[in-house]
Amino acid sequence: MEKPRGTEETPSSEPMEEEEDDDLELFGGYDSFRSYNSSAGSESSSYLEESSEAENEDREAGELPTSPLHLFSSANNRALDGSGSEPAVCEMCGIVGTREAFFSKTKRFCSVSCSRSYSSNSKKASILARLQGKPPTKKAKVLHKAAWSAKIGAFLHAQGTGQLADGTPTGQDALVLGFDWGKFLKDHSYKAAPVGCFKHVPLYDQWEDVMKGMKVEVLNSDAVLPSRVYWIATVIQAAGYRVLLRYEGFENDASHDFWCNLGTVDVHPIGWCAINSKILVPPRTIHAKFTDWKSYLMKRLVGSRTLPADFHIKMVESMKYPFRQGMRLEVVDKTQVSRTRMAVVDTVIGGRLRLLYEDGDSDDDFWCHMWSPLIHPVGWSRRVGHGIKMSERRCDMSHHPTFRKIYCDAVPYLFKKVRAVYTEGGWFEEGMKLEAIDPLNLGNICVATICKVLLDGYLMICVDGGPSTDGSDWFCYHASSHAIFPATFCQKNDIELTPPKGYETQPFDWESYLEKTKSKAAPARLFNMDCPNHGFKVGMKLEAVDLMEPRLICVATVKRVVHRLLSIHFDGWDNEYDQWVDCESPDIYPVGWCELTGYQLQPPVSAEPNTPQKGKDATKKKKKQFGKKRKRIPSAKTRPLRQSSKKPLLEDNLEALGVSEPVPDDIIAVCVKEEHQDLPSPDRSPSPLLPLPTESIKQERDS
């Protein structure tokens, strides 16, 4: 029966909701984007809100807010340090701040951009509702639905291109200039530190699921079909985020093995092709090796392991960082470590922050991790009694894009919490002696003195015999820091202790030194000496920040392990550039982290990584961390800024594997009859058993 005009059925939300439920069922009911851009008071949704052009320009690559509902609940349980402001959640982007710093009288939005974007979405939603005959609403509705794979792909592959203002390549540009970890590890038989050793990186607590022998579905680069096809591969070796894969069918032939980063969207659990109607095609090199690929795969897959179905979803969730461009905070002054300065977040890449000093030039920056002990919320210095540089005249930075986006101070609970201290029964006192890592020469552990005791467990420490007499070289450590040690720590652990300047007696003797200086050593019970089972071993490879030039991340080796203390050696550099770091330092990363986040990795400066460079640069006088720094790459001023555009994903993968663009050939794809087989399931398994995606297997044969 024909319906009267004007009474046609309008699209309702019910089919869309059913479709969403179906999507979630495929992945265990988990959708990492359900709360991505939702407001605190709106319903949870897996849709993406349509943003205006102004908002898209404001977004920086790698800056993704955390779930606002989670932050809002956390805010209610924590008091803001030193301020009586209540927490507020932006209804557009979900960022958390203080109400007094938010935009407009209603304090609903963090910036003008968010307010306009929200208004634009509301208007579009109202127009759409009128066209569909629905009652108007004031809420900003979702206008488009994006597939979960598209969202993940956009996030993992679009980390930004080009260079930062300081000349650091990012995103695809960084990958083009990337270091070949696979060849480096294979040629020298090196071992990489496991991802589980690094508690500040994505999926560190789930990387035990990645094991030798597990099966995955990967892009088939050895096929001449016009569309993207996949094939099953086996993990031969795991090295950080990178794995050595071998296509099924090559068996013991390692000539076609290839390295791949598991964080990319071209690696999937078994069954992904069947679910997403993708074709499994054997590589051309071995397509004639078997006549019945289906039976072969069934034998190879039964009882094997694969990645969890929500592996990439959790990867994306773990790569969302609460810091955003425009947030204000306090950071150590790199020109005088005894004080802090006000700074603004300019860039966020993989949790690492590029900070711009408010009273400096547009290129006066400082790099650190968001968990670094060198950054603090606004007001921290005044509260604990630490020195801060108060600028009488603020530089005119109105032309700088970052300073035009300042909208709120970073709230205290975004920073890593320090351990609570209890001063009853004795505490650190001024004049006490101890041993500490020199922040201006990170390869040395020196004799040091407590110069001032601050509030909340913070201590101002100076190296004995230092050049400064005005306290400008004092530095702040928390009492729970793993960079300070009781007297005789170096002696007990066979570490060379740097004595005070002018001290002639060798070896250094603490007892005679304390008697000579009429001082006492800090009690050993006051130091935090717990040692976790971190998993680091001598010789392991990793990626480490050069703290003398903290925007650089370099190929490095664990040279020595002393309890939880690691001596990091930069491959290709002299031993004088070695650095002591804690096993939980946020400045060390697993192999493949730079590739995963789109950060440029600095390769060794010589072909032999363990041979110190004998050239001019390796033997020059050592520089201070916050002073004039040595350069590993050309400076931003002398290097041209490279403009580049994003490449198609297929082209990127083919270039990475050294394969030219496939040319369509006369190939017949033969469908294989679908069969089902029940698989045994063990009692406990670190990763799921494989389904048999035989319905998606196709075979190539010559015409």
Swiss-Prot record:
The lineage of its organism: Eukaryota, Metazoa, Chordata, Craniata, Vertebrata. Residues 35-49 have a biased composition (Low complexity). This is Lethal(3)malignant brain tumor-like protein 2. A zinc finger (FCS-type) spans 81-116. Its main location: nucleus. InterPro entries: Mbt, MBT_L3MBTL2_rpt1, MBT_L3MBTL2_rpt2, PcG_chromatin_remod_factors, Znf_FCS, Znf_FCS_sf. PANTHER family: LETHAL(3)MALIGNANT BRAIN TUMOR-LIKE PROTEIN 2, POLYCOMB GROUP PROTEIN. There is a cross-link at K405, K647, K673, K698 (Glycyl lysine isopeptide (Lys-Gly) (interchain with G-Cter in SUMO2)). Residues 15-25, 50-60 have a biased composition (Acidic residues). It comes from the Eukaryota. The modification Phosphoserine is found at S13, S67, S338, S681, S685, S687. Zn(2+) binds at C90, C93, C110, C114. Part of the E2F6.com-1 complex in G0 phase composed of E2F6, MGA, MAX, TFDP1, CBX3, BAT8, EUHMTASE1, RING1, RNF2, MBLR, BAT8 and YAF2. It is found in: Nucleus. Pfam families: MBT, zf-FCS_1. There is a cross-link at K698 (Glycyl lysine isopeptide (Lys-Gly) (interchain with G-Cter in SUMO1)). One of its GO terms (biological process) is stem cell proliferation. Residues 619-634 have a biased composition (Basic residues). Residues 1-70, 604-649, 672-703 are annotated as: Disordered. It comes from Rattus norvegicus (Rat). GO terms for molecular function: chromatin binding; histone binding; histone H4K20me2 reader activity; methylated histone binding; promoter-specific chromatin binding; zinc ion binding. One of its GO terms (cellular component) is nucleus. Putative Polycomb group (PcG) protein. PcG proteins maintain the transcriptionally repressive state of genes, probably via a modification of chromatin, rendering it heritably changed in its expressibility. Its association with a chromatin-remodeling complex suggests that it may contribute to prevent expression of genes that trigger the cell into mitosis. Binds to monomethylated and dimethylated 'Lys-20' on histone H4. Binds histone H3 peptides that are monomethylated or dimethylated on 'Lys-4', 'Lys-9' or 'Lys-27'. Keywords: Chromatin regulator, Isopeptide bond, Metal-binding, Nucleus, Phosphoprotein, Repeat, Transcription, Transcription regulation, Ubl conjugation, Zinc, Zinc-finger.
